[in-house]
Amino acid sequence: MRLCYLFLSFILFSIPVQAADYVAIQHAENQSLKLLSLSDSLDLALKANPDIAVAIREREAIEGVKVQAATRPNPFVSTSIQDTRSATRQIYFQLNQEIELGNKRSARIEAADAFYSKADAELATKQAEIHANVVLAFYELLVAQERVTLAKSSVEVAESALDAAAKRVKAGKSSPVEQTKSNVATATAKIELVQATTQLNNSRKRLSALWGDNAPSFEYAVGDVASIPEISSISALQTRIDNAPSVKLAKQEINARDAVTKIERSKATPNITLSAGVVNNQELGGLNQALLGLSIPIPVFDRNQGNVQEAVSRKFKAEDELIALKNKIQTNLLTQYERLSAARQASLSLQNDILPNAQSAFDAANRGFSLGKFNFLDVLDAQRTLYQAKSQYINALLEAHQSIAEIERALGEVVDHQITKP
């Protein structure tokens, strides 16, 4: 019996806490499994994400706006007849050309360039968002894989304990209550395995959906969830707020609104239309006479003042939005950095103190039970404590990776996921 519980102890303590170990074991069993790394996930998402494709199409559309902004007004031809009698008829032929004043064309070109830069910034912002989503989804998948592994091991331990309890009851060495408790523990472990498996399937789908694949083609994610990437100090991160993708986008929005304001102000200057043509005068024996003309609107009532006011207000609005955005990023950055620090500290405490103590308690419970000093409830309680400690450790690691992903969502790619910090 002592050997049986020592074997149970070995099973529980051999539960891996790193996704790399998990993948290595599975890969050794079947070399045909398809493995996915974080870099693979990022490459797939940045190349095939539908939202990024939308942003690229928008930038392509602005290229057409740039072409159109540089065009000049087309000339137009007009003709008219005065008097329908052939003897006194006068026929007018005119070529008219509108001349833009007030730097309208240069203002349009400047605005088109500004909106193209804005589209570029929107693309960069979307790429940063997708990058963060991939990092977040990938580490959630690694954690889901760890939870399945932990749940499977827990089921194995529970089933072995159930078998041992049944034998002790049959031999008259234990109360039937112990077998009932072991049955409950086994059923609970199986439920947790079903829940962990469901979470794993959902995590796989969430990750693959980021590159438009609703049916994941990979089998396992390769990575070390226990390695938390190294990140700069909070003061160093704060200096990068001005270069954050969303801040750059907000600045480009201000530039675009300023360019629109210039367009609206240029419209206050009316354009002129020059005309040149001939008049065929039948009264003078069909003589052709030169015809020159000039027309210009008189800006008495409409000076485009309403549109100018709107454009100026929208520019001020964009400036206020930039200030609000920076404040939001600053607050979020502080929150996520504190969250990261707490998660890192929790993971270290669990790894160095709580998990070893939980393991010692489980070993002691096993030894005591085999010597008749503890009852079976003590063994189950020690087993559950160890399982919860490992779950807390995995959750702390996930918290750390989630915080890093949110920091990258705010500031862009500021972390090298290959460089880790214990």
Where are these regions (language model features)?
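Periplasmic alpha-helical coiled-coil/stalk elements that build and connect Gram-negative outer-membrane
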Residues: 5, 21, 126-243, 336-339, ...
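Sec/Tat signal peptide C-region and signal peptidase I cleavage site
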Residues: 15-19
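Short, charged, amphipathic alpha-helical segments
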Residues: 110-113, 176-185, 376-383
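Acidic, low-complexity, intrinsically disordered peripheral segments
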Residues: 6, 20-25, 30, 392-422
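Amphipathic alpha-helical coiled-coil segments
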Residues: 54-69, 126, 130-151, 160-162, ...
